[in-house]
């Protein structure tokens, strides 16, 4: 018996040596671009069709990918109900900033829009509303004079037609190429929201990743109901800048959606797949009966 066991060990050893010496053949696999995406949080490779079917949310860790304004409307509104407004208002270069026109052109190509804010009307489960979406693919969704004007006109349109208003924010803040003109939009958009308050119309603000700077410090934080989409960074300035300014250590994760909910900055944190249902419920609860 021992002889048989020794013989078996010897043959296994020979087999392993042969396998080790055998050259490994590798054949390159040509995978076309746009087939897979890598999750920023867990680094998993995800088949893009699976990602789209899952609302652009990682199936492994639930990280919410950034999406453009067109997809946002697709996931939020009833099919074929969106009617755009104010698309004829476009940005110029009022301060003559170098390379601003080139950045605008690049933003148009990346976002396939002529500005960072898409405004219009639509329906959610048959309920009419005014809706606006900031697109972070257009100059990081920054708010310049045209974005501020479109937002203000959308608010005025909602007030005039007795419509509830929903705005999705995704922005790095004020557009530095427009200087003080961009900062003025903070006061302008915030002041316009009084029109809805006077008429008893609900304004729902949905903060997505990221909502920062002058946008976070103005209309995005002034909703009657403030919602944060899961996986969103929300805050005014970066952690390093704040620490240098106040000279204090900051709480861990202080700009996350969970922290904002804990401290009362937002009322709800909602998964993207549940946003339409949540908005539909809120619109029904705050429906304003208009008698003609």
From Swiss-Prot:
What highest taxon heads this organism's lineage?
Answer: Bacteria
| Residue intervals of the CoA carboxyltransferase N-terminal domain | 35-292
Record: residues binding Zn(2+): 39, 42, 58, 61
Q: Which keywords has UniProt assigned to this entry?
A: ATP-binding, Cytoplasm, Fatty acid biosynthesis, Fatty acid metabolism, Lipid biosynthesis, Lipid metabolism, Metal-binding, Nucleotide-binding, Transferase, Zinc, Zinc-finger
| Annotated Gene Ontology cellular component terms | acetyl-CoA carboxylase complex
Q: In which pathway does it act?
A: Lipid metabolism; malonyl-CoA biosynthesis; malonyl-CoA from acetyl-CoA: step 1/1
Record-given protein name: Acetyl-coenzyme A carboxylase carboxyl transferase subunit beta
| Native organism | Acholeplasma laidlawii (strain PG-8A)
Q: Which gene encodes it?
A: accD
């Amino acid at each position: 018996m021992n002889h048989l066991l020794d013989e078996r060990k010897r043959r296994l050893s020979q087999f392993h040596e042969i396998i080790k010496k055998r050259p490994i053949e590798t054949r390159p696999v040509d995978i076309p671009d746009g087939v897979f995406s890598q999750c920023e949080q867990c680094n998993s490779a995800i088949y893009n069709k699976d990602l789209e079917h899952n609302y652009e949310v990682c199936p492994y860790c639930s990280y919410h990918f950034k999406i453009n304004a067109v997809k946002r409307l697709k996931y939020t509104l009833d099919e074929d109900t969106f009617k755009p407004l104010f698309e004829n208002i476009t940005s110029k270069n009022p301060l003559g900033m170098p390379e601003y026109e080139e950045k605008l052109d690049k933003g148009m190509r990346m976002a396939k829009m002529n500005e960072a804010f898409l405004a219009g009307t639509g329906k959610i489960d048959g309920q009419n509303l005014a809706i606006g979406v900031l697109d972070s693919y257009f100059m990081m969704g920054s708010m310049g004079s045209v974005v501020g004007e479109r937002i203000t006109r959308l608010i005025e349109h909602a007030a005039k037609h007795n419509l509830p208003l929903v705005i999705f924010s995704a922005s790095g803040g004020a557009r530095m190429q427009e200087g003080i003109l961009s900062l003025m939009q903070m006061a302008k958009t915030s002041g316009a929201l009084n029109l809805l308050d006077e008429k008893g119309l609900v304004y729902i603000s949905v903060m997505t990743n990221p909502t920062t700077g002058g946008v976070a410090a103005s209309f995005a934080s002034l909703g009657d109901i403030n919602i944060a989409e899961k996986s969103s960074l929300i805050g005014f300035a970066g952690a390093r800048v704040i620490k240098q300014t106040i000279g204090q250590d900051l709480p861990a994760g202080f700009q996350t959606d969970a922290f904002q909910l804990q401290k009362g900055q937002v009322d709800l944190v909602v998964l993207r797949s549940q946003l339409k249902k949540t908005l539909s419920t809120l619109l029904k609860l705050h429906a304003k009966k208009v008698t003609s």
